[in-house]
Amino acid sequence: MVPEAVDAVVNELAGISDIFNIALDEDQTYVEVIDQAIDEQYLAAMKTVTVDPELVAKEGQSLKFVYSPLHGTGQYIGEKALQQAGFTNYTIVKEQAVIDGDFPTVAKPNPEDAAALEMAIAYAKETGADAVVATDPDADRMGAAVRLADGTFQVLTGNQIAAVLVNYLLTAKQNTGTLPDNGAIVTSIVSSRFASKIAESFGVTTADVLTGFKSVSYTHLTLPTICSV
């Protein structure tokens, strides 16, 4: 929880003198079921963040890769997002496209763990793919591996993926004239300085926050004068 939310909860608890006499509100309007409409809004929002749509339209189909949801939810929204963006030349790891909380094909469903990518890499070697992408079971983390010149695959660390993404985003924004003068990237305090050094070379500052997407997204309130890129 972000600070304001924590304060609100603490203040509410401070006003309770007897937990056994708390009035229970049975008004179910506080419960909102998230349905397909939210998925559609999310996919629509994704269309707005492609920094170089012309490049994607031209080259997206030529990128051949393998995707694994590691027995999780990523396949549902992931495939729609990929196809919508123009990345359609991919293969799904069928054995790992079945939702299963026991994660039968991996010891740990961590996409940054090389062992978790073994099946996807085998698919990539068989199909001649250039890269492998995997998401963790609840699809809020990812891992990747890329084909090297000798045909082997190198599993990238989270810091390496971040550095590649930052360099691409800032380069693309610079080339398209959309890099703001007061730009900033947001990283967590456990990240390496690799991405920050790249940002610095573009004249972009770095905001370090606590781990978790809630902390990253919270910067739109804490850094109102900085445009996050």
What are these regions (language model features)?
Residues I198-Y218:
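Glycine-rich active-site loop/lid that clamps phosphate-bearing ligands
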